[in-house]
Each structure stands twice: as C-alpha cells, then as structure tokens.
Amino acid sequence: MDPKDRKKIQFSVPAPPSQLDPRQVEMIRRRRPTPAMLFRLSEHSSPEEEASPHQRASGEGHHLKSKRSNPCAYTPPSLKAVQRIAESHLQSISNLGENQASEEEDELGELRELGYPREEEEEEEEEDEEEEEDSQAEVLKGSRGSAGQKTTYGQGLEGPWERPPPLDGPQRDGSSEDQVEDPALNEPGEEPQRPAHPEPGT
C-alpha cells in the first residue's frame, strides 16, 4: 500500500501548476530560469545581468559566476618573483649566519675578560689525553723489554697496581719447568704400568 501511495503523490505533484494563472506562471519562470535560459543568458548577457537577483535566488547563478576570474583564486608567481624571493631568502640566511658568528665572538670576548678561556681549556685537555696515551705506550714497551720481571708502576686510577709478567717470560720459564717436570711426569706414567702387570696375574 505504501509504494502505491508514493506513486500517487509523485504523479499528483506536476498537476497544480497548470491550474495557475499565466501571469503567475511567467513570474515563476522568471524567478526560476531553466538551464536553456541560463545558457542563453551566459552567452548574450552582460556581467550586470549575470549578477541579477533572480539568479542569486535560484542558486544556479553560481555556475555563471564561477566562469569569471575569481579574485581569491591562487595565481602562481612569475619567474622573476620567484627569483626575487629566493634572493631575499639567501640574503636573510647569510645575514643570520653573520649575526650568529658575531654574537659568538662577542660571547667569547666577554668570557675571556671574565677569565674563562674555553678554547685553551679544551686544548689543555686534549694535550693531557695525548700525554696519558704516550705514557701507556711507554709502559707497554718497558714491560716487553723486561722479560719475566714483575715491575710496579705509578698509581693508576684506583691506586697502585702491578702489571702481570709479559707473555714472553712465562714461555721461557715454562719451558725450563717442563724440562724439570718431564721426569716427574714419566714417574707417574710408570706407576700405572706397575699395577697393570699384576692384573693379568690375578
């Protein structure tokens, strides 16, 4: 039942305008122009007629207005304008760099006046580190030169410490110890052979 009622409503809608007076029909047509009328107006009308109130009310005059050049539309800058922008940007960057460099120099001058030479302190720290590395290299050379001798060096970070003997020393000592221990190794080797003889007898 509902779909039939809807169809009846749809067919009954266009009927009333035929009962209106021809004057009212003309007024309605003027207020609501058809697309064909709008097309004709757009071809032959002047800008003043395009902005007429009845087209504003209809809302279709927007299509006509959109054909005009919109003052708010984005227009890309020309090559000359782009070059000017780039040059001004580069100049501002160079000015900023110069200002920063001059500010740093001023700060360094003030710090030197106050007695805080930063650069000199950094150089001294680097020299101290190089001296420590040189002293460590000398210690390693000295330990290699004294083969097998335990040498004590100056205090380290945690206190006095002894460097273990280098690898060259124990090999020499170990070779002599192995020669001394060889007969001792042979003796225990002979001991298991002695009980091995009575086992087959038992």
Swiss-Prot record:
N-acetylmethionine PTM positions: M1
Pfam families from the UniProt entry: DARPP-32
One Gene Ontology term from the biological process aspect of the record: intracellular signal transduction
Disulfide bridge partners, by residue number: none
GO molecular function terms listed in the Swiss-Prot or TrEMBL record: molecular function inhibitor activity; protein phosphatase inhibitor activity
Species whose genome carries this gene: Bos taurus (Bovine)
Function: Inhibitor of protein-phosphatase 1.
InterPro entries: PPP1R1A/B/C
Biased composition (Acidic residues): 119-136
Name this protein carries in UniProt: Protein phosphatase 1 regulatory subunit 1B
PANTHER family named in the record: PROTEIN PHOSPHATASE 1 REGULATORY SUBUNIT 1B, PROTEIN PHOSPHATASE INHIBITOR AND DOPAMINE- AND CAMP-REGULATED NEURONAL PHOSPHOPROTEIN
Gene: PPP1R1B
Cell location: Cytoplasm
Biased composition (Basic and acidic residues): 41-63, 109-118, 191-202
Ranges of compositional bias, category Polar residues: 89-100
